[in-house]
Amino acid sequence: MNKFDVVVVGGGHAGCEAAAAAARIGVKVALITLKPENLGEMPCNPAIGGRGKGHIVKEVDALDGLIGYIADQAGIHYKMLNHTKGPAVWGPRAQIDRALYKSAMYSTIMNYPNLTTIFASVEDIKVIANKVTAVIVNGKEIYCQKVILTTGTFLSGVIHRGKEQIKAGRLGENASYGLSNTLSELGLRLGRLKTGTPPRIDSRTIDYSKLEEQPGDLIPTPFSEITKKVLVPQIKCYITRTNEITHKIIKENLHLSAMYSGQIQGTGPRYCPSIEDKIIRFSHNASHQIFLEPEGLNSNTIYPNGISTSLPSDVQENMIRTIEGLENCKIIAYGYAIEYDYVDPRQLKRSLEVKSVDGLYLAGQINGTTGYEEAAGQGIMAGINAALAVKKQDPFILDRTDAYIGVMIDDLTNGIDEPYRMFTSRSEYRLSIRADNADQRLTPKAIDLGCVSQLRKEVFQKKLSKLNTLRDYVQSLTITPKQLQNCGYQISQNGIARTAFSLLGLPNFGINIVKDIYPELNRYDNNLLLLLTYESKYHAYLERQKEDIVLFKQEETYQIPQDLNYDQIPSLSIEVREKLKQSQPETIRAAKHINGVTPSAIMAIIIFLKTKYLNSSITDKK
């Protein structure tokens, strides 16, 4: 076979999602990756999800993507992060068995309808009159209408460990230099980014008696709506910390770190700093937390999350053995930093197609993101849009009000200057685009596109029907304050009747109390009642948020006084303050387009200015 509608280059998280999504739309797809074992590879931490990231996993699943369902076949330690806060910012996360994940992904991709997998290296892309026509594999052309590049860290990748430099996309795998040259020749602006990984440790050499246990959730919450129950055995993780001796060794050897010797020019991820960065940027901290994460049920390898490093191997040995519980540990593989090319994502349409090259799409780390989840979110969008373009249909665009995927793509196409990672704080609409309602928001859109399986469609429609029926029912149940008092529950004695739906969202009520008042609710699915609880809890806030959105859009053009002291705005993060002070934007619109200045930060500035200049317009303040 040498002719396809869509060719996907790379078999990581972005590539697998892109290929599967395009295939679901019904076009002929080829996924080209170097080796079978590359499919679904997790080269960094053995975990999926988290704050913001977990939302993307749920959204990809809602579009009938792979990452959530595959993760549920390999999840060995589930944890709902931020559970003490509101449901809008809960972050579903799971430790993943690498071998199980890769096996499940391989089986899925190799048996996917409309999808052919080719194990080879793509040497070049053929472009005629600014239009993709083929990819070059082993000197031969494979013709196609659309190409999706999901190259990860392979574009001109260089591994750094101390003074050692190795040309590689990952340890032991060759980098791609031809594609970097091709992209440059096409006139695309490339930049250089960096990420890193910690040393891996033999679990049999760790003294767990000295460590703090970190159990997972008693009842795992699956990522996928298709998953009825997590069947994989669950295990514990452990926590330890660096100490002053650890920091002393690192400081004494900073000149040997590739990051601090000037050897690496690429920008590293702000939110996943190396241990060298941590002890410099946070020198006031006496220690830093390390999560010891198992890489699998049958693996002796531990991933020490929190100490990625580019220090020489001997320094890594000395450093790690100062840490409690790791005094006699054996290092299986040493940590390293990797530097790679990325394409400035401002050159992309929101469909993830390159503006200047018809039919060329980019997804994943090539766009400057970091993380499996961000890659998967871009991959599924690129795959859907490439397939729609083949069918000459309009692109599928998610905006900031639709999904975290929409927030991410909007942020990327407005420009970034450091590896991009998703957080809930990046969304000004996070109360409405929650993890729990991802399917309600996106699965109907996916059904309309024709990119969901019959199983997904049936599962969703059955759930939605039950949810709507239950919502109508709890909204029909009413009770007066006096009747509530007779049941033993106090509420404002204003004579106004409440519905069971409104009671679900009250701080001192919730499911159990409402069930006590209405025992007939015990026959309904508790998970559906939970969804209605979240809806009720945020109902009033969502109404107010509509006003915030109007205010936000109206006040984008307001001018900012040049003497404004950003330190006086307490809700701004240190990062945001630094960027505002550096850029000194003249208007709210200018501030909005500074990378890293979140929509919630913009709202905080507007409210601060409104308060400070309460009796006059802020538009003329200088």
Curated annotation (Swiss-Prot):
Transmembrane segments: none
Binding residues annotated for NAD(+), in chain numbering: 268-282
GO cellular component terms, semicolon-separated: cytosol
Subcellular localization: Cytoplasm
Keyword check for Cytoplasm: yes
Major location (coarse): cytoplasm
One matching Pfam family: SAM_GIDA_C
Gene Ontology BP annotations: tRNA methylation; tRNA wobble uridine modification
UniProt entry keywords in alphabetical sequence: Cytoplasm, FAD, Flavoprotein, NAD, tRNA processing
Swiss-Prot/TrEMBL cofactor(s): FAD
Superkingdom of the source species: Bacteria
InterPro entries (UniProt xref): FAD/NAD-bd_sf (IPR036188), GIDA_C_N (IPR049312), MnmG (IPR004416), MnmG-rel (IPR002218), MnmG-rel_CS (IPR020595), MnmG_C (IPR026904), MnmG_C_subdom (IPR047001), MnmG_C_subdom_sf (IPR044920)
Family in the record: Belongs to the MnmG family.
Function summary: NAD-binding protein involved in the addition of a carboxymethylaminomethyl (cmnm) group at the wobble position (U34) of certain tRNAs, forming tRNA-cmnm(5)s(2)U34.
Subunit and partners: Homodimer. Heterotetramer of two MnmE and two MnmG subunits.
NCBIfam families: mnmG_gidA
Protein name: tRNA uridine 5-carboxymethylaminomethyl modification enzyme MnmG
